[in-house]
């Protein structure tokens, strides 16, 4: 199935049929700003839990409220396009709220997946999914991968001017393109 960016209503229509046909719908969500291998492995694990993987994506406005000024680094449409291009992802739904509760309560996936950094009792949508007969699964985090850590590394290595502050190895020199 080709991945698509859908509205919540489109996803309910499209994947409601899949559920009626016995296909298991899996849902996960996040900001997914600066996608890294930890995210990819999480999507792959989530996809293995069912037949269809839908990713809820925080809008730019909700990311700013959650993460602060300067975020997201990648605009929502571009983040959605990147996610939709992944083989493991069947659809992407952008949502404006701070949490995906409304999306989850309307979509009612068979499986709700979150990263292992979320305590089980704090996973938004848990009650709705379990009340509808679904289950909630925490997937393990991949060590050494974090968007916040990547951003910190960038900040430490580059000053406000964008020039690399780290010393260059001896003998290295910057080159300029010819005019």
What are these regions (language model features)?
Residues 1-179:
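Nucleotidyltransferase catalytic core that binds NTPs
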